Structure formats: C-alpha cells, structure tokens
A protein has these predicted regions:
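Alpha-helix N-cap/helix-start motif at coil-to-helix transitions, marked by capping-box chemistry
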Residues: 173-177, 396-399, 518
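Non-catalytic terminal extensions of PLP-dependent enzymes
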Residues: 7-165, 173, 185, 264, ...
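Conserved PLP-enzyme active-site core in the AAT-like
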Residues: 7, 17-28, 39-51, 55, ...
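Short glycine-rich or small-residue beta-strand-to-loop segments that form or flank ligand, phosphate
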Residues: 193, 286-289, 539-544
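Long, structured ligand/cofactor-binding scaffold of large enzymes
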Residues: 141-234, 240
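Mature N-terminal, pre-catalytic/accessory segment of carbohydrate-active enzymes
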Residues: 1-4
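A short linear hydrophobic-aromatic micro-motif
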Residues: 192-193, 350, 528-532
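Short, basic, glycine/proline-bearing loop/turn elements
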Residues: 33-36, 165-169, 190-191, 285-289
C-alpha cells in the first residue's frame, strides 16, 4: 500500500527530501495526506485544516531566527515550526517523515489495522473460504473479471476464523473485542456488539436475549417487522400496541403523546393481562422507533422519563438514525446521552450503520447501556446476551463488514465526527432553502415561520444549532400530524422530505390537482437520481456527510425541469420514456393526465385516511391470538390462501405490509377488518390500473386471474379458530 501524501506550499523555500508524493496545498484532498508543510503567509490554511479536526501535523517553515513568527504559529494545535536553513533540510525531512508516519499509524481503527497487517503477511492458506484470497476466481475468465472489478484486497481480507490472530468475532476477543470496545466508547455505550447481517438480526438478538413467553411488550405500531419476529413470534411476548400518527401526505409519524401516560399503559395491560396491571414495573421490554423512516425523530429523554419506571428495558430501534448524538442540538434525541440511575430502565439501541453512517450493506450494531441496573434481577448479563448473539450470527463472518463497523467508529471519534455531521446538517438546510426558492410544486417539510421569520430567512449556521427550526410543534397545522405533545418530535435534519402539491394541509383534504410522488420518483430515477423512497405525496432523500453541493444543485435542477415539463404538459414519453416503452397503456398520455388520474384515484379512495386509520387504536384489527401462536398454526399447515376480498373477519397467519417501510399493518393473530382489507384492496386496484407503479407487498400474494392481479392472504382455517 502506498503511504499517504504530503501537502505543501513551501516548495520553493524548503525542498523536503521524501519518497512521499507532494501535493500543492490548493489541490489537496486532506483525508489523503499525512502532513502539511506551509509558510508563514498560510495562516488561513492552518485554520481551515484545524476545522477538519483530523489532527494533521502542520509544519510551518519560517526564516531562521524569526522568533516572532515562531511564537505566532506555535499557539496552533498540531503545529511544528521549523526554519528554512539549508543545513537543516535532512534533519527536518526526517522529523517530517516521523510526524507523517506517526499520523498514519494512529488513523486506523483497532480491527482494521490488524486486518491490514494480516492480509499483508502472505500466509499459505489451506482453510476457508475456498477462493483463498481470490486465487480460485483467477483460474477462470469469469472469476478474473470478478476479482478485477472489486480489487485484490477485498478477497485477501475475506478470511476464515481458523487463524485466531484477529480474535473470535462470536466470543469477542482480540482485535475484534478491541474494535467493539472502542465503538462503545465513541457511542457512549457500556457495551457494543457488531452485527453483520443487518438490524433485522440486531433486533432479534436483543429480543431473544430479553423476552420470554408471556412477557409484556410495549410495542410501537411503527416497529419494523423484525421486532415482531424477534419479540412476539420467537420470544412469545404479549404486545401492547401504541398507536402512531400519519399525516395526509403519507409520512410516517411518531407515537401519540397519550400513549406514554401511565394510566393509558396500565389500561392496555388490563385488556391483555389484568393480573399484571398493578405491578410496579409490569413491562419487560418497550420497543420504540427512535426515528421513523420518514424522518420524524423522538425526544428520547422524554420517553425514558415518562415510561422508564414501568419498563425493565427499552429498545430504541435506531435503524434510521444513530448519528443524533454527534449533532449537538439533537442531544435530547439520543438515548445514549441520557443520565441513568438504578430506577431507570436498561437501554438498548440498535443502529443500521449502513443506512446513513459509514458502513457496508448489512452492517449493524447494538449498543447496550445498562450498567446502572447491574445486580438487579432484571439485568441481562453479557453471557445471556451473547448467547442470543451467537444463535443469530454466522460462524463464517465477512471480515470487511466487521472492519467497516470498526472504521465507522473511528470516523465518528471526537470533534471530527461532529464536524462531518454539522456540515451535513448545514448542507441539508441549504438544500431546503434552494427548493423553497426555486420550486413551486415541491416544498420541504419545515415550519413556515420560526422566531417570527420565514424558515428560509434564518441564518444557516444558527439553524444548524437550533432545534426550533426542526420542531414538529404540537397542534400546528403545517405538518399534519396529530396527537403530539410539547417538544415530543422533531424533523430529522438529515432526511430531506419533499412534499408534492395536491393536499390542503389545513383541511387535511385532497385538492383538485396533485402530483403523486411516485411519478416524481420514477422521473428522477430515469434521470440518474435515486431517492430513498416515496409514498402518497412526499418523496424522501437521505443526507449523509457524503453529500456535496453539486449533488444538491443537480437534484433541484431536475425538480425544476420536471415542473417545466409539467407546465408544458408534454407527452409522457418525454418524461418517463422507460415506462411508456414497457406499458402500451401510456402511449398517448401526457404528463398531467397521468398525475391527474393517480391523484383522482387517491382522492376517490381517500387513501391517506385509510393509511392513517391502519395505525390508530380505534381501527386496529382485533387481537385474537398471539403472533407466536398464529405462526405455529401457519407452520402446522392450518392456514388457507383465500382472496383478499374474502378476508374480512378471518385471522391472519402472516404479517401483511408494504415494503418499504416494512411496518406490519396486519399482525399475525389479528382478524382482518374492513379498514385493513380496504387498504390492501386499494393497492390491488392501483396495481391493475397503473402498471409500472406496483409497490412491493409482503404477506399478501398476487396471482393473475382473467388478466388481472388478484390479492390473496393466508388465514387460519375456520375449524381451527379459537372458540369464543
């Protein structure tokens, strides 16, 4: 591997002797250098470099004997002052090389450092994996193409645990343990576990470690399906469902404020398990989505204060966040920054590092913060927790994913991590301002007025440090969410949620014309811009420190171009050529016609209201049997596949859900009711009316019948239904 370069501006007065590549300061990519050599006129560069918080060694070259300049520069961090005397070039060159090498040695995280060293050792391999550093692949043209595409190091780093030098990933020893210990420190956890097959598995590990059959589970109705699988189906927990909000745009909101009241929770317990209703701490585990897919993030401190005394543990599923503790204004949103005592619940946080942090796909981590209850009966020891970890983990881990988790922690260490996210937040603010300024059919989900000024008139730096600019104020009409309390929820500044026209948000009604977001999403994809997801009248873009101003400008430019095409009402083939090519139906369509037809369909079905009712207690399907029992009936073959049109009143054996977002609408063991049936029948009708815009649906099966897609679901055969 090549050593890092040196950035310099002092070439003329200090010709350093080095084998490293020298790069002009004005052309420098600072993450790729190990030292910077400057002159006394470069004081502005010192400030810029220090603002990155990389702790790069900075060497300032001054004239020999210039004590004033020496004193001026010595006050800066990581700065070394040398003179330009020719007689000292060799000495200073060695000093600079020493500083550069020392910097290189400390930038790598524990496991990644060990992995690099191991792959360079050129061992003769007679173990797994069978490709043995890529050599097997190289025996065939197809394999060589594969290796050439990914690069040799990836294959050399794909190792077997037959050699224990890197530590055992399942029992947490050696460099593997060092990496998890380091991550725990960075993320303010007592213990951290790296998970290599996604947060679906992380959630199952946590729930398998904590939940036993019959335990009460306070269950956010927004929870990902993996929480149902782990806590309710595998663990056998008894769910107490908490209703959640949706706004007319289709955005996923948080749990209603009333659901966190002790009286409300104890009444739920009386309905399901009255013998536990008066226990001091009746809830074994609460499972709460810290941030929804659509960027509504909770006040974690408030949640812990309200329900903590009722719960042994709270699991914050933070798949869609995890970076909040590195954004100072979001401190109240981080469960890992809350001060905890012996009467508080144990805190578990699961994070999908691959979503918006720096990780390969499937990289996830579990943060365990429960030392404050160590010694109490409710405490889950490492041995018990790790038993669940090993039950859900492969004995053949992919080391590069583990290394990525390790490196992610290093990136977030100290001020550097906070700096990266601060810049991301500022760019997100600028993106929203750009949309407000340039677009007429799109607007960001932000308060219209903050501190008596229009949102977009705020100072970006101030806005990036003031959560008021992202507050979902209780009772405010502009966001459309109901049931929120004071400072209970905020907009995630790192999720750019754009709303499309078509909704009168003050009245929560459909207007005469609207732009369904699915059309915009398809248009952007056809123009090489990939949004994360969309629903009825909103489209979501994830923001990370990877973003650039150029990317944002390109996005806004394409949105403006879409508006231009819409105003001209051009033929659809000019907007969505791939769609028209694949589906004859749209051959003579113009863009406004397609927008109008889908909008009218939404309006005629009032699908936003149907979606909202899916998650309200009043309209939840009847709980007939536990999800675990329903799944057992499914395994025993006691289910039957029937048309969805006949499902009303029947007991579901599978969770049914659109994907994304992976939130179950009908849980196993619940009885299909009118609202749930109508919602999925709407999806069935939309699939038939608007080919090319089909959503992915799980737990509902589609079969062709008389040229149309017909929806089916698996329900319990009537002869096996519980007797009333």
């Amino acid at each position: 591997m090549r050593p890092l370069s040196i950035s310099e501006s002092a070439k003329k007065i200090f010709p350093i002797h080095t084998k490293r590549e020298l790069i002009d300061i004005k052309e420098t990519d600072f993450p790729a250098v190990s030292a910077v050599i400057l002159t006394k006129t470069d004081i502005d560069w010192i400030k810029k470099i220090n603002e990155l918080h990389f702790d790069l060694p900075i060497i300032v070259v001054i004239e020999e004997g210039n004590e004033e300049a020496k004193n001026n520069f010595s006050k800066f961090n990581s700065t070394v002052v040398i003179d330009s005397s020719k007689k000292n070039i060799e000495l200073y060159s060695r000093k600079i090389e020493s500083l550069a090498q020392k910097f290189e040695n400390k930038i790598d995280s524990p496991f990644f450092r060990a992995l690099k060293e191991y792959t360079l050792s050129a061992n003769s391999e007679f173990d797994c994996p069978g490709h043995q550093g890529g050599e097997f692949f190289m025996k065939h043209p197809a394999g060589k193409s594969f290796v050439d595409f990914f690069g040799e190091n990836l294959f050399r780093a794909d190792l077997c645990n037959a050699d224990v030098k890197l530590g055992d990933l399942l029992i947490h020893e050696g460099p593997a343990y060092d990496a998890e210990k380091f991550a725990a420190k960075v993320f303010n956890a007592d213990k951290t576990y790296f998970v290599l097959n996604g947060t679906s598995t992380s959630n199952k590990i946590v729930t398998n470690a904590i939940v036993a059959p019959g335990d009460l589970i306070l269950f956010d109705r927004n929870n990902h399906k993996s929480c149902c699988h782990g806590a309710l189906i595998q663990g056998g927990g008894i769910p107490l469902y908490l209703q959640t909000s949706r706004n007319p745009y289709g955005s996923i909101g948080g749990i209603y404020e009333e659901c966190f009241k002790e009286e409300y929770i104890r009444n739920l317990i009386k309905e399901k398990c009255p013998e536990k209703a008066e226990l001091k701490r009746p809830i074994r585990l609460a499972i709460i989505e810290l941030g929804t897919y659509d960027g509504v993030i909770s006040n974690a401190k408030q949640i812990i204060e309200k329900i903590g005394k009722l719960c042994d543990y709270i699991l914050f599923d933070s798949a869609w966040v995890g970076y909040e503790q590195f954004i100072p204004m979001m401190k109240v949103c981080s469960p890992l920054l809350v001060e905890l005592g012996p009467e508080d619940p144990g805190i578990i946080v699961t994070q999908s590092v691959h979503k918006q942090q720096a990780g390969f796909s499937q990289s996830s981590q579990i943060h365990k913060k429960d030392n404050h209850i160590n010694g109490q009966d409710r405490y889950v020891t490492h041995k018990r927790f790790n038993n669940a970890y090993m039950m859900n983990s492969s004995t053949s881990p992919f080391y590069p994913i583990f290394a990525a988790l390790d490196v992610n922690a290093k990136i977030h260490e100290g001020k550097a991590g906070r700096c990266l996210w601060h810049n991301c937040v500022k760019l997100g603010i600028e993106a929203r301002k750009m949309v407000i300024k340039n677009c007429k059919y799109f607007k960001p989900l932000v308060p219209p007025i903050v501190n008596e000024k229009k949102w977009e008139e705020g100072d970006t730096e101030e806005m990036a440090n003031n959560l008021d600019y992202f507050l979902l104020k209780s009772g405010a009409k502009w966001h459309g969410f109901e049931g929120y309390g004071k400072r209970q929820y905020f907009i995630d500044p790192c999720k750019l949620n754009l709303l499309t026209v078509g909704i009168d948000i003050e009245k929560a009604e459909y207007e005469e014309f609207g732009i369904p977001a699915v059309i915009v999403a398809n248009y952007l994809r056809e123009n090489s811009i990939i949004p994360e997801k969309c629903d009825l009248n909103y489209i979501l873009f994830l923001l990370t420190p990877a973003e650039s101003f150029a990317k944002i400008e390109n996005l806004v430019t394409q949105l403006c171009e879409f508006e231009h095409l819409l105003d001209k009402n051009v033929k659809l083939e000019k907007v969505l050529p791939d769609l028209v090519q694949k589906h004859e139906k749209y051959k003579d369509y113009r863009i406004r016609q397609l927008c109008q037809e889908i909008h009218d369909f939404y309006k005629s079905k009032n699908i936003a209201l149907l979606q909202k009712k899916l998650f309200l207690k009043e309209y939840l399907p009847e709980y007939v049997m536990s999800p675990r029992d329903a799944n057992i009936e499914f395994i025993r073959g006691r289910g039957e596949l029937i048309p969805l049109s006949e499902c009303k009143g029947r007991i579901a054996l599978e969770g049914s859900l659109p994907y994304p977002p992976g939130i179950i609408c009908v849980q196993p063991g619940e009885r299909w009711n009118e609202n749930t049936q109508e919602y999925f029948l709407c999806l069935e009708e939309s699939i038939n009316r608007f080919p090319g815009f089909e959503p992915e649906i799980q737990g509902v099966y589609f079969e062709k019948k008389d040229g149309k897609s017909v929806a089916y679901a698996v329900v319990l055969k009537k002869e096996f239904e519980p007797k009333k």
